[in-house]
Every structure is written in structure tokens, then in C-alpha cells.
Regions:
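Charge-dense, helix-prone N-terminal extensions
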Residues: 1-200
């Protein structure tokens, strides 16, 4: 696909690329994963009849080379954009991506850069601390207890959409020290009792 500096620039000045196959994307990563600061991949929308690299295929390739997905953006009626960048040194792992990395390693697809990211995460504790995704995140026992002690908060929590529910669960999970975690739970219970949300 050529030098990323020659591609169109958008948003945060990362290039926009499109690939037809996983092989094309992985060959690009093989050449650029250490030199590029990231890309926006144009991925075909479902139902458009356009074929090409899928999000799942793009993510697998990224993990193999030590990269990670980021924000999504609109492009046009046929394509949407997905940002991919090299994984930062202290970047958190999701349980979903951790499982994919294990599967890719088992299949012999992991490259040196991806394997190095996994090893660093295992050494510094990020591997064990991987967070659950929005679809699988469960309400922890300490939050359940806090909600049970405040019926108004418990009632409002049950009405939250998935984004606001996960925003609370993720922030509680990210608290490294028990006192910090307890304070966050107390704050979110009070917020819910006041019928307030993190996202509008």
C-alpha cells in the first residue's frame, strides 16, 4: 500500500489505508510496525456488498505485531474507520484481546513484537489485571453491596444503558488500591442515587 506518509491525512494526522486481505495488512505491519505511529483503516460496512479486510482480521494482525485498536470514526456510506496504533508501554489489556493473543500464539501467528508485548504485560502484572469487555463485565460484589444499601441507587443502576453501566464497572476495576476502589464505589453510589450518569 506504500509509504503511509503519502496517504491522505485526517483527524490526528495518521494516514488512512485500506486493505483487501489480512495478508496485505500483515505485510504492511511487517514493514511499518516499528516506524509508524499508527493508521486509520477503512473497513467495509456490513450490507454494502463491499469486500475486504474485516475488523476481526485487522485486530488479529495488529495483536500479532504489538499494535492495538482505538477509536472508531465515520467515513462514508461504504466504509468506516478504525484507528490502530502501537501498544503503549503501560497500555491495559482487555480479557478479549488477551484470549486472542493466546489463540494467535497457539496457532504460530504471533510475531516477535507481539510476543514481546505479551511478555512485558505478564512481567508487570497487566496480563493478570486484564479487564472484562462491555458484553461480559460483571457487577463486583463490593459494588453490589453498596447498591443494596442504597435502594435509590440500585433502582437507577438497573435502568442504565450499556455504555453508562460499563463506564462505572471499568472505573471501579481500574482502581489499584482498596481505599481508592472503596471511594469510587461510594462516589458512584451517590451519583446513581442522584440519578446522574457518567455519559449524557
Amino acid at each position: 500500500m506504500g509509504d503511509p506518509a503519502e496517504r491522505s491525512q485526517i483527524r490526528d494526522e495518521l494516514p488512512t489505508l485500506r486493505f483487501d486481505t489480512p495478508g496485505e495488512w500483515e505485510r504492511w505491519l511487517e514493514s511499518w510496525h516499528e516506524r509508524s505511529s499508527g493508521v486509520w483503516l477503512a473497513l467495509a460496512k456490513r450490507g454494502t456488498g463491499v469486500t475486504g479486510l474485516t475488523y476481526a482480521e485487522a485486530l488479529d494482525g495488529a495483536i500479532c505485531f504489538g499494535w492495538i485498536d482505538g477509536q472508531k470514526a465515520a467515513l462514508d456510506e461504504r466504509f468506516w474507520l478504525q484507528r490502530f496504533t502501537p501498544r503503549r508501554p503501560r497500555s491495559r489489556w482487555s480479557q478479549i484481546n488477551r484470549a486472542r493473543a493466546d489463540e494467535l500464539a497457539g496457532a504460530g501467528r504471533m510475531r516477535a513484537a507481539g510476543a514481546a508485548q505479551v511478555e512485558r504485560a505478564k512481567l508487570d502484572g497487566r496480563w493478570e489485571a486484564a479487564y472484562a469487555g462491555q458484553r461480559t463485565a460483571a457487577v463486583p460484589e463490593d459494588l453490589t453491596a453498596g447498591l443494596a444499601a442504597n435502594p435509590a441507587a440500585q433502582e437507577f443502576f438497573a435502568t442504565l444503558d450499556s455504555a453508562n453501566r460499563y463506564a462505572i464497572l471499568y472505573r471501579i476495576h481500574e482502581a489499584k488500591r482498596p481505599p481508592t476502589r472503596a471511594r469510587r464505589i461510594e462516589r458512584y453510589v451517590a451519583m446513581l442515587a442522584a440519578r446522574e450518569t457518567i455519559h449524557p
